[in-house]
């Protein structure tokens, strides 16, 4: 459950990466046919902030019905926060983390069974992302807040005994738009998420078995 970097938005603005490129699809390939990855990426999605210019981007409004649509799930992967750094929201990293907590709590309330949780702190916004010719919705303060998210998200993960991954340690934003993952970033992130899930013990009882099982993972 994420934003444009889960959707697979291309940095050059020409649409969406194909299923051979998106990290969600590569993760599906890593897990194989015995497991099912559910893609829930939406461009512009935030944790709790309503965007007056783009309808339906508030993750808190969508997570409940999304969980109900796909119940039962075994693992929820959350990667949100980049759009919360936009200047019009004027949010600190602590505020964004509090928004993430609200999303998690609502997901728990709407789930038909307990699920494991993996929190991913998103890649950093690139230097100069708000410069002329790039994305005017961000500025230098946005860049700084994006760099502070990992510290706050790690605290949230610890509170929920959840898995945690700092995507900024794995990939950089494309130089084309200073905001979105490129092909190599998607590949690196898919491998890192797979490793985190398998090596941290998330879904361990379902992954290390001799017969395939249905594994629903909302990403």
Ranges and model annotations:
Residues 1-42, 48-53, 66-70, 76, ...:
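Serine-esterase "nucleophile elbow" of acetyl-processing enzymes
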Residues 42, 203-206, 210:
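Short, flexible loop/turn segments with low-complexity composition
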Residues 47-49, 175-176:
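Short Asp/Glu-rich motifs
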Residues 6, 47, 82, 213-214:
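Ser/Thr-centric signal marking residues that sit
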Residues 207-219:
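Single conserved hydrophobic/aromatic residue that forms the stacking wall/gate
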Residues 25, 33, 57-204:
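Alpha-helical cap/lid subdomain in secreted, periplasmic
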